[in-house]
Amino acid sequence: MTSFFDSESPSNVAEYSVSELSGSIKRTIEQTFEHVRVRGEISGYRGPHSSGHAYFTLKDDRARIDAVVWKGTFARLKFRPEEGMEVIATGRVTTFPGSSKYQVVIDALEPAGAGALMALIEERKRKLAAEGLFDAGRKRPLPFMPKVIGVVTSPTGAVIRDILHRIADRFPVHVLVWPVRVQGDGACEEIVAAIEGFNALQPGGPIARPDVLIVARGGGSLEDLWCFNDEAMVRAAAGSAIPLISAVGHETDWTLIDHAADQRAPTPTGAAEMAVPVKADLEAQLASLSARLKGAAVRQMDNRRQTLRSLARALPSLDQLLALPRRRFDEAAAGLGRGLQMNTANKRRSFERSAAHLRPDLLTARIVDRRQRVVDAVNRAERIVERQVHRGAARVASADASLRALPSRLIGQVHRASDRVSAMSRRADAAIAADLRRLKSAVAAQDRVLQSLSYRNVLQRGFALVRDAAGEPVKQAAAVHSGMALSVEFADGRVAAVAGEDGTPSQAPKKRPARAGEPTKQGSLF
């Protein structure tokens, strides 16, 4: 009986282990596909990693294959791989026996024709334009005369020499060069860092902040200029706070940074011409404008001088304008002085007449003090009026001098001088009237005081004043002796009398009793 698993006939097929078969497949594939060119679209792009390698997948509409670009190869690429880019990869196929996978190890990478790159550029252009990065409204004008220009380009080559030479020829200014790579691995990052670095400079800092930036590169193929189509660079150019000029390639070469920049120059030399004007042209324009301005000023001065002469001839003479104000001022000054003197003299005479009736032994000190105050007040009033008169005369003299010097302001100054004289006259009249009222009130008050203290008021109440032969009042009975001539003064006159012997009357006169409620006619001395 035969086993179910026994082979019915011996096999001629060789038997391999898994490792042997995987190794055989690896050798076969790598020998067969040692050098291949694969056309496909980049998908799942990852890289470069921290190791420097880049991983992605090449695909078409029916299949896909993994690919890897090692660090050394990636640094030699002319452009950076991007998601969705159609490329032609040159390399070799290798497998991994441990996982039964294969991939293409890429030695060279190039775009699959200009059409593929242009399609990618157009797609990116539409995306960035939709975000408003290319809007004309956000573009700023270039400064007319920048003091500092920042240049982002390679430090070697003809580009930087052309820019520096052109700026020196047209209008020499301070130039700051930020050296960068303009092609190959790391070029995009360096240019973005340069743009952001210039914008990070602070005004007034140790390094001058540029007034305008130039990002420049010479001509080249689409692959050579590819980094200037990078999205990060376009965003850096659009976000620059400093006006930026792009000068990449030749006039026919357009990159996305040209659309984001504030100005696009066809060549680096053209960028230098945009950045600075021609100094000689500015000097010529300045000289022409200066000559025109000087001529216009001379003509204007001649016209104004002629107009002034015509107006001066039409004005009346200075003496005619000043005659009436001078006469009014003289009359006012003369009348003011005379009136003040007359009023002062009248008040002084009135005061002296009033003072003549006053007893020198009553309130002498107060009267003298009041008189001195009145005299001081009169003197002050005279000085005030005199100063005002002199001040008015000085002002009129000043106005006269000003009118002679400035005939165009003659009429206004005459009116103001007349108003000031009138105001001074009114103030002087008011001051004199106030002083006279104050003096009159003072004299009336003193008169009332004298009247209230006069002994005649006592005589009116029935008392009598006894005087001796010398006319002095007799104040005590002991001062009277028999036979002494006396003068008794009553309210209505005086009576001569002779003192009799000392003694008391034998019978005192009887006093008529006063009726109840009847007021006595005899007042009290106190």
From Swiss-Prot:
The cellular location(s) given in this protein's UniProt record come to:
Cytoplasm
Q: Reply yes or no: does the keyword tRNA-binding apply.
A: no
State whether keyword Transport applies. Answer: no
GO terms (molecular function) for this protein are: exodeoxyribonuclease VII activity; nucleic acid binding
Q: Which GO terms describe its biological process?
A: DNA catabolic process
EC numbers on record = 3.1.11.6
Quickly give the catalysed reaction: Exonucleolytic cleavage in either 5'- to 3'- or 3'- to 5'-direction to yield nucleoside 5'-phosphates
Which InterPro entries does this entry report, sorted A to Z? Exonuc_VII_L (IPR003753), Exonuc_VII_lsu_C (IPR020579), OB-fold_nuc-bd_dom (IPR025824)
TM region(s), chain numbering: none
Where is the region Disordered? 499-526
Q: What is its main location?
A: cytoplasm
Alphabetically ordered keywords of this record: Cytoplasm, Exonuclease, Hydrolase, Nuclease
Q: Name one GO cellular component term.
A: exodeoxyribonuclease VII complex
Family membership, please give it: Belongs to the XseA family.
Subunit and partners = Heterooligomer composed of large and small subunits.
Its function?
Bidirectionally degrades single-stranded DNA into large acid-insoluble oligonucleotides, which are then degraded further into small acid-soluble oligonucleotides.
Q: What is this protein called?
A: Exodeoxyribonuclease 7 large subunit
Give the source species.
Sinorhizobium medicae (strain WSM419)
